[in-house]
Amino acid sequence: MREVVIADTGPLVAFLVRQAQHHRWACETMATLRPPLLTCEPVLAEAAHILRRHGCDTDPLLALIERGVLNIAFSIETELAPLRQLMRRYRDQAMSLADACLVRLAELHDKPRVWTLDSDFRVYRRLGRLVIPILMPDDESRKK
């Protein structure tokens, strides 16, 4: 079974915004990933909001879905009970709905890896206790 890459907001925005701090890293990483990357609607909503806030067009984000690079592979309605449980468990982290959806997506796949800039994913656990593998710039590059 192949690894499933789950895309978070930060790398998607960094990939699409040339001026973003992690643009180069996001582009280099994207070039190594095998589509489709899985994501959820809250991540897309966050990304669209951030893109607009920075004066960027949201069309390239939607084009990633249209081209099959991103796949919306999640239903909040179907996964409502586990999402509520995750958000209660990580109340102290102020877990967002987007993060809860990504953790739940990681729980639904045997070999997940979350592509993120969010250090909270170092704390979150799938299925209660399993570390979630992440794709994240190393700590030195995050300080630059």
Feature names for model-found ranges:
Residues 1-39, 51-63, 135, 139-143:
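Short, well-structured N-terminal submotif of metal-dependent ribonuclease cores
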Residues 18-19, 50, 86, 127:
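Residue-level signal for well-ordered alpha-helical positions
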Residues 73-115, 119:
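Active-site neighborhoods of divalent-metal-dependent phosphate/nucleic-acid chemistry enzymes
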